[in-house]
Structure formats: structure tokens, C-alpha cells
A protein has these predicted regions:
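Active-site mouth loops of central-metabolism enzymes
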Residues: 23-35, 90-105
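Active-site groove signature of glycoside hydrolases
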Residues: 112-133
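N-terminal binding-site loop/beta-alpha segment at the start of enzyme catalytic domains
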Residues: 1-80
Length: 337
């Protein structure tokens, strides 16, 4: 039996691997039976994963309902660290950022109801809303914290400037950006000479990475010529369109060979270990919608990549992918009105 690596967020001990529930919501990744989704959450806890990350947008509330069912089935709320989000609205025209005070109050009560809990451990702004002052949003969150409805506050997809503005009003415990072998914007982009990753490390802001496996591209099951069902989010991901798809698959194949020959590991295990070994990363979120998709968790724990391996990984990615693209296509629309 392996021993899960842990860290702390706002003084609470959490697993360094967190369960991501985007796929469990049933939209964007294909349907999953509710009993299987609940079993996935419970199986994660059995493997030492106590942090579950969810959001109202995941299945339009369904993922939160699944997590709530898992909490009730387990019976001990304190065994879980529940992170959810707010700040997105949707209609027939698409998904919009909306962090107004009215929307925030509405979303908090809805999330508490769906999760069946009195308190959310980590409440995160899902995306920046350029039409609502960050200070206004942060002030309302601080009020929720004083009321005991929220324990810790976080953001997702925020720049350094936006995080600075937020924490001038309320305590900031975490940031959740996209980060994986192929998407390194928090490493590469600089604000006043500093990366988001280094800023968070210096300012004691925990990093929880989403898309750790780059929409399953690094999961070991995607292959050349693969097609995706209608409604699958990868159908609109530019990484999965030629000629980029072939370049990314070349990188995956070379990384898989490197992982196997150097460590006896899979490309999935290599990809998650790479994220965990980056300075400043607290938690790598691992998306799963079936218990068996967590089988590889044990292969990620209790080993590390050395500097030579990190350099070789960088070389493989740089040589293989000549026209990289990030996850910008996932950003919500600017709210009307």
C-alpha cells in the first residue's frame, strides 16, 4: 500500500492529488452512470485522495450533486476537502463569466444545497469577470467566510495583477491554473519579470493544476487518427486537429518511450509526476469518471524526476511540437449588459 503525498491549504492537510470532477458531470466528456460516478469519488478517498474539486458548470450542477451523494454515502464529511467554484453563467448562446454579487449569492446557496453541506472548504472564482470589479467579488467572499459558509478562498485562471487585487481585500489561499507538460503558461508568461508559478510560491498561494493530463492527451489512451463523439470537448480543442494533433502525438509517443525506458513508468505517470515536481505546485487534479481510471495513482507517488529527466522532457516537447497552442479556447465569453 502506497502512502499518499500531502500538503496543506489554509492550514488543512490535503492530498497532493485531487479528484477533478469535470467528466463526472456528464457533459463535454460523455455520460457516466450516477452510481459509477459516486463510486469514483468514494474510491478516490480509499486511495488517499481527500480533495475533490468540482464546479456548478460541470454538468450544470450534476457533478456537485454526485459529490454530495458521495459525501452522504461515506457518512463522514470531515474526511473530505471539498473545493468548488462560482462565476460562470450559461444559456443557449454559450458560457459567460459572471461574478456579480447577486450571482455569487445565488451560486453559493445552490452549491451548498447540491453538495449537502453547510460549509465549502475552498471556494474559487472560476474565471475572471472583466465586467465586475475583483474587489467587489472578494469583499462578498470575505463576508461568506465570516459567516462560516466558506473556509478558504481561491481563484482560477487569474493573472498576478488580478490576484494582487483580490488579496488586497480578502485572504487568498489558492490559484487553479491549467498546467501540464504541453501547457506551461504559468511558467512562461511574465508580469514584471515574475511568473505566476513563482509568484504563488513566494506569496504562499497554493497551486492546484487543472488539465494535468491535457484533456487526456497525456493519459496514454489517445492515439493517432482517433475521433471523438459529438459533445466531446476535444472536438473543438485545436490540439486535436491536424496538423497539430500529429505533432502532439509524436511528443506523447516519445515521452512514453522515455518514461518506460528510464523509469519503467507510463506516460500518464510521468506527466503527473512532472507536475508534482514543479516548484510551487501543491496539488495536481486528476480527472476520472470511473474507479479504474484511478488505478495509476499509486504509480505516481513516492518517486521524483531529476534535473536530467526534466531537461530531456523539455527537449522532447520542444522538438516535437513546433506550433504549440494553449487552452485559451476554453475561456468564457464576456457577459453582455
Amino acid at each position: 500500500m502506497f502512502c499518499m503525498e500531502t500538503t496543506t491549504i489554509a492550514g488543512v492537510k490535503v492530498s497532493r492529488i485531487g479528484l477533478g470532477t469535470w467528466a463526472i458531470g456528464g457533459l463535454d466528456w460523455g455520460a457516466v452512470p450516477d452510481d459509477v460516478a459516486v463510486a469514483t469519488c468514494l474510491n478516490a478517498l480509499e486511495r488517499g485522495i481527500n480533495l475533490i474539486d468540482t464546479a456548478p458548470i460541470y454538468g450544470h450542477g450534476h457533478a456537485e450533486e454526485i459529490v454530495g451523494r458521495a459525501l452522504r454515502a461515506h457518512g463522514r464529511r470531515e474526511d473530505f476537502f471539498i473545493a468548488t467554484k462560482f462565476g460562470l453563467d450559461w444559456n443557449e448562446r454559450g458560457v459567460f463569466a459572471n461574478s456579480t454579487t447577486a450571482r455569487l449569492r445565488q451560486e453559493l446557496e445552490a452549491s451548498l444545497r447540491r453538495l449537502g453541506t453547510e460549509t465549502i472548504d475552498l471556494y474559487q472564482v472560476h474565471w475572471p469577470d472583466t465586467r465586475t470589479p475583483i474587489a467587489e467579488t472578494a469583499a462578498q467572499l470575505a463576508e461568506f467566510q465570516r459567516q462560516g459558509k466558506v473556509r478558504a478562498l481561491g481563484v482560477s485562471n487569474f493573472s498576478i495583477a488580478q490576484m494582487e487585487e483580490f488579496r488586497a481585500v480578502a485572504p487568498l489561499s489558492s490559484n487553479q491554473p491549467p498546467y501540464n507538460l504541453f501547457e506551461r503558461q504559468i511558467d512562461d508568461q511574465r508580469e514584471h519579470g515574475q511568473s505566476i508559478l513563482s509568484w504563488c510560491a513566494v506569496n504562499n498561494v497554493a497551486i492546484l493544476t487543472w488539465s494535468t493530463l491535457c484533456r487526456s492527451l497525456l493519459g496514454g489512451r489517445v492515439h493517432r487518427g482517433m475521433s471523438f463523439d459529438k459533445g466531446d470537448i476535444r472536438r473543438v480543442d485545436p490540439k486535436f486537429r491536424e496538423p497539430r494533433f500529429s505533432e502532439y502525438m509524436t511528443a506523447v509517443e516519445r515521452l512514453a518511450a522515455f518514461a518506460r525506458e528510464r523509469y519503467g513508468k507510463s506516460v500518464l505517470e510521468l506527466a503527473v509526476r512532472w507536475v508534482l515536481d514543479r516548484h510551487g505546485v501543491s496539488v495536481a487534479l486528476w480527472g476520472a469518471k470511473r474507479p479504474d481510471q484511478l488505478d495509476a495513482v499509486s504509480g505516481v507517488i513516492s518517486w521524483q524526476l531529476d534535473d536530467a529527466a526534466m531537461a530531456e522532457i523539455d527537449r522532447i516537447v520542444k522538438e516535437s511540437v513546433t506550433d504549440p497552442v494553449g487552452p485559451e479556447y476554453l475561456a468564457p465569453k464576456v457577459r453582455e449588459g
